[in-house]
Amino acid sequence: THDSPWYRLYSEYRASRINPDDFLNRMFINAEAVKAEYEPYDLVWRFWLMACVQQCLDRNVPMWDLFTEEEILAWTEVENYCFYLQKSKDESNFGRGWGLAAYTLRHILEESAKDIRLGRHGVNLNFGHDGTVTCLLVNLDADNWGKTVDSPDKVYDIWQNWNIPMGSNVQFIFYRNDDGEIILK
């Protein structure tokens, strides 16, 4: 993964937005010793991830206080860009993310076609995490999800990974009109 084009783009953008030394120097008496043991960006990212996850727990531990407002915004933009590089139609991921969703979409449509052909009524449920749902929306060109940009600084304007919930409901409703024609809503 670290040799892939998308990861290089992600790393370059991360380096342009985040200085791990600022955080590490605030947190540790001897930041150099810590950096000798841990990759600086990875360690700071783990603290940021803990702060993100902590807000979902029933304990009120204010981990966001470890970061400046600028660092919180920077990490939000960087991780949003990472998600974009992994899941969008950006050329750097060679279609891996949305290619997986193409399989999911094909499965949904094939199962639906079979039910329609056999005259069945019912529901087919397919489960996918937020990444799968995002890629599905990319394939469908829903809202801005299918768009690409030419600069990492523009991603934030069209792509916000926090708008994809961990649990989603995407529905394809097929029905026949009075003439028996199948219509997709």
Model-derived segments and their meaning:
Residues 1-124, 128-185:
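Signature for phosphate-centric chemistry
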